[in-house]
Amino acid sequence: MTQAAEADGAVKVVGDDITNNLSLVRDEVADTAAKVDPEQVAVLARQIVQPGRVFVAGAGRSGLVLRMAAMRLMHFGLTVHVAGDTTTPAISAGDLLLVASGSGTTSGVVKSAETAKKAGARIAAFTTNPDSPLAGLADAVVIIPAAQKTDHGSHISRQYAGSLFEQVLFVVTEAVFQSLWDHTEVEAEELWTRHANLE
């Protein structure tokens, strides 16, 4: 225990802990994002704006990040669906499935990719593992060189589980949206008209 632990065993977080860990997260995200191949991301971005609908699928925290990406792509004017939602239609030929799995082996995500492939849809994937089943199914792959969630004690990250992958996934999807938007003359006010008004 450090000074953050009191004599009775209760943990007392102090300001220095937060400062140090903000720096830790910031530096790990910056270092890892800098190692992502921008050409891989550009190929994925071009897949997104091809004709067809966009579907997103991911488990756990990766899935939550892709939900955020789906929201931005909806703001951009694309037709976007989240796999598993009750109103999500069947994927079909010409559509794109955007998936994320740190390991590239998450069973539900791989199964979704296999189903989409059989339907004639395109697959774009984010993963840490270029040799994974998910990467093998994908038409476009972005490798995020972060630790996998089961890689405890990794030299890549001091953070728990798949945190670094999920953080960089968020940053990369935000960069994709920003890059797509940069190539239009659409004002923020127009994007805002698509924002949910039933909140």
Curated annotation (Swiss-Prot):
The keyword Methyltransferase is annotated on this UniProt entry: no
Residues at the catalytic site: E166 (proton acceptor)
InterPro entries: PHI/rmpB (IPR017552), SIS_dom (IPR001347), SIS_dom_sf (IPR046348)
Reactions performed catalytically: D-arabino-hex-3-ulose 6-phosphate = beta-D-fructose 6-phosphate
Pfam families (alphabetical): SIS (PF01380)
EC number: 5.3.1.27
Domain SIS: 44-186
Record pathway: One-carbon metabolism; formaldehyde assimilation via RuMP pathway; D-fructose 6-phosphate from D-ribulose 5-phosphate and formaldehyde: step 2/2
MF terms in GO: 6-phospho-3-hexuloisomerase activity; carbohydrate derivative binding
Expression induction or repression: By methanol or methylamine.
Keyword hit for Isomerase: yes
Binding site for substrate: S62, S101, G102, S103, G104, T105, T106
Biological process annotations from GO: carbohydrate derivative metabolic process; formaldehyde assimilation via ribulose monophosphate cycle
Keywords on record: Carbohydrate metabolism, Isomerase
Matches recorded under Gene3D superfamilies: Glucose-6-phosphate isomerase like protein, domain 1
Family label: Belongs to the SIS family. PHI subfamily.
Role description: Catalyzes the isomerization between 3-hexulose 6-phosphate and fructose 6-phosphate.
Protein name from the UniProt record: 3-hexulose-6-phosphate isomerase
